[in-house]
Amino acid sequence: MNSLREWEEAFEQAVDVKKSYDLAKRMEEPKTNPVLGYRTAGSKAEWETGELLLKEMQEMGLQNVQKDKIKVDSWDFHHAVLRYRDKEGKEYEFQLGAYQTDFHTEGFQEFSMVYLGRGTAENYENIDVKGKLVLIDINQREEWWINFPVYQAHLKGAAALIAVQDQGYGEIHDTSLNAQDIAGPKEAAAFSISQADAAILKEDMGNMEKTGNYTGDFKEIQVLFDAQSTVVRDRESYNITGMIPGE
């Protein structure tokens, strides 16, 4: 081949784009959350996808295809659903995202929810959050990572923290959900909610501006919450590798 373009054309002719696309779509089928997806480390969905790729690698002719066992802190997020009836009697059901923490309600349970601005120590002054859901705003790009307000809520006795992205990540649309890594004890439960859904909840709480400054009497709302998020340490997973024949 005498030119880069000739090499590019030969490469394009050899690559089966449709097969790659179809495989990627098949990889979307195993999921831990039937509504949102998720295929996380150590989960049944990850194992099923790994077996799919193992078979594909063998069938396409890769050599020395093997599974190397590893231990991971696994996370299996099945669902997090929040129901709320507003002051006008309208009922809502919100799908929440989650972070890698452990929380099980075993069906819908009633919780009090409070909105605490940025979730700083100052925001908690004179407020009892024991056993409650704490809603906060967060900008993970320019302020702090999710584990800081989550651990603060955990130390204060909150049942779980629910974060809504306020600038930073998760800004592609007001209905988007954020999912990123977290560092902390698995019992410090954390979930994410979209800006659009959070706005409905905040409208009825009305006790704080987004800055966290009080604007009136403190107010809680009652919600129903059903969540299943499971973290298990030292679960088996696999790295799957194969070698392309040739030199």
Please give the residue ranges for each predicted region.
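Short alpha-helical segments and helix-capping/turn motifs at coil-helix boundaries
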Residues: 50, 78, 121-122, 142-151, ...
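A conserved hydrophobic secondary-structure block that centers on an alpha-helix together
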Residues: 119-170
